[in-house]
A protein has these predicted regions:
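Non-catalytic accessory segments flanking P-loop/AAA+ NTPase cores
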Residues: 1-240
Length: 240
């Protein structure tokens, strides 16, 4: 028979969990505030793990260096120089972010490049296959699951999750032509994604607990094959 846990033991466990969570926030903040990698240094690190894709690695390196140096400098100013709490600092950091669109064939290393970059920065990384998503209220995953996956990748820490990276795979598959029926896996998903990608305050419902999570500082990398992209461009140019 399992022995019941004493109130003192429960208290010690709660204190330890709080300590671990605070340490996790502190480490993530330290890495972002001290982040000083240049795009050249980031790409050199990626070269050790990702073969080829020179143009893609350069674009991702520039975007990530800009994003986290911007965020790090803003948090340093708010927290270190002005003495603001993390919640206030994240809300007050309003400089615009630039998300990334990566185009390339399946298996060329788009997702892995983003994962390598997230490890170098020291932030959580979540991958989402958009072909499995549908509009809220229908069978399948919906965009709120993206926030939950990011929260899980951050060890349940909402503050750390707000500074993470999300890779949106197969983004080209949710493109839709004009249709007369309700498109729950195309246009419906697009509308939900737009809110997240632009940066918004969101609520994750965990049953007995509700967690607020902003995507204002989450870096989104959208990847797709876009097989007929060249043909689409040619047809549009021909019309013009």
């Amino acid at each position: 028979m399992m022995e019941r846990m004493s109130p003192e033991t429960r208290r010690q466990i709660r204190e330890k969990l709080v300590e671990l969570r605070e340490n996790q926030i502190g480490e993530a903040l330290r890495q972002i505030i001290e982040f000083d990698k240049t795009p050249v240094a980031l790409k050199a690190h990626m070269d050790r793990f990702v073969i080829g894709q020179e143009k893609g690695k350069k674009i991702i390196s520039v975007a990530i260096a800009y994003h986290y140096r911007r965020l790090g400098n803003a948090l340093k100013h708010s927290m270190v120089e002005n003495g603001e709490e993390l919640d206030v600092a994240l809300r007050n950091t309003t400089t615009p972010k630039a998300n990334i669109l990566v185009v390339g064939p399946t298996g060329c290393g788009k997702t892995y490049t983003g994962e390598v970059a997230s490890r170098l920065v020291g932030v959580p990384f979540a991958v989402e296959d958009l072909t499995k998503f549908s509009e809220v209220g229908y069978v399948g995953q919906n965009v709120s699951d993206i926030l939950l996956d990011l929260l899980i990748a951050a060890g349940g820490n909402a503050h750390v999750a707000q500074m993470g990276i999300v890779y949106l795979d197969e983004v080209d598959k949710i493109a839709t032509e004009s249709v007369v029926y309700k498109d729950v896996s195309g246009r419906g998903v697009q509308k939900g994604l737009l809110k997240l990608v632009e940066g918004a305050e969101n609520t994750i419902d965990l049953g007995k607990e509700r967690i607020s999570l902003s995507t204002r500082h989450v870096l989104f990398i959208a990847g797709g094959v876009y097989e007929d992209l060249e043909g689409i461009v040619k047809r549009r140019m021909a019309r013009d």
